[in-house]
Swiss-Prot record:
Family assignment from sequence similarity: Belongs to the universal ribosomal protein uS4 family.
Subunit structure: Part of the 30S ribosomal subunit. Contacts protein S5. The interaction surface between S4 and S5 is involved in control of translational fidelity.
Protein name, UniProt field: Small ribosomal subunit protein uS4
UniProt-listed GO biological process terms: ribosomal small subunit biogenesis; translation
Name of the encoding gene: rpsD
Taxonomic lineage: Bacteria, Pseudomonadati, Chlamydiota, Chlamydiia, Parachlamydiales
Length: 206
């Protein structure tokens, strides 16, 4: 899968929040949206607002591609119950995201790299696929040889972040477990997200 290589700071400025949790908050230096007239926010159309909600969600989960987002939505449609909740659950239970939620990486992008480079185990077996769906009861851990990596220890010690209630964390053993399926109200998104708006947008565009 292609990795996003654009400016993450521009994205943070666009939404007015340190959306990726970067150590150097890009808003401290440039608080306005990118562009010559960044300080002036023009009123968006309904389509523009829907599009922005979708783009925010893609950003939160590590700059997912349009194809990936649509695939998750179509899977959610096939499940019984609330489509929006199923959709959010699948995004939240991606391995790279839960590695980030367990504080093994400072950012979602650092977590993606840990997975891709083979530092992560699921139930004791190496999994290097970022989109791997973690199920309740599965244990995520750092490979023993990788536990000396400085950035992992630094991320675990970051007091600014906490582990959400649907995960248990064993910092001493560099591991954590998904306790239950997360619901949208529990997901620690750094910015407000409207799932109904996103699902409505995807329903009319796929």
């Amino acid at each position: 899968m292609a990795r996003y290589t654009g400016s993450k700071n521009r994205i943070a400025r666009r939404y007015g929040v340190n959306i990726f949790g970067r150590a150097r908050n890009p808003l401290l230096h440039k608080p306005n949206p990118p562009g010559v007239h960044g300080a002036r926010r023009r009123k968006k159309s309904d389509f523009g607002l829907q599009l922005e909600e979708k783009q925010k969600l893609k950003a939160i989960y590590g700059m997912l591609s349009e194809k990936q987002l649509v695939a998750y939505y179509k899977k959610a449609l096939r499940l019984e119950g609330n489509t929006a909740s199923h959709f959010a659950e699948m995004l939240e239970c991606r391995l790279d995201n839960l590695v980030y939620r367990l504080k093994f990486g400072h950012t979602i992008f650092a977590a993606q790299q840990l997975v891709a480079h083979g530092h992560i185990l699921v139930d004791g077996k190496k999994v290097d696929r970022r989109s791997f769906q973690v199920k309740p009861g599965m244990v995520i851990s750092i490979k023993e040889k990788s536990r000396k990596i400085k950035i992992i220890a630094e991320a675990l010690d970051n007091p600014a972040r906490s582990v959400p209630e649907y995960l248990s964390s064993d910092k001493e053993h560099f591991s954590g477990q998904l306790l239950a399926k997360p619901i949208p109200e529990q997901m620690p998104w750094p910015i407000e997200i409207s799932l109904p708006v996103i699902c409505d947008f995807l329903a009319h565009s796929t």
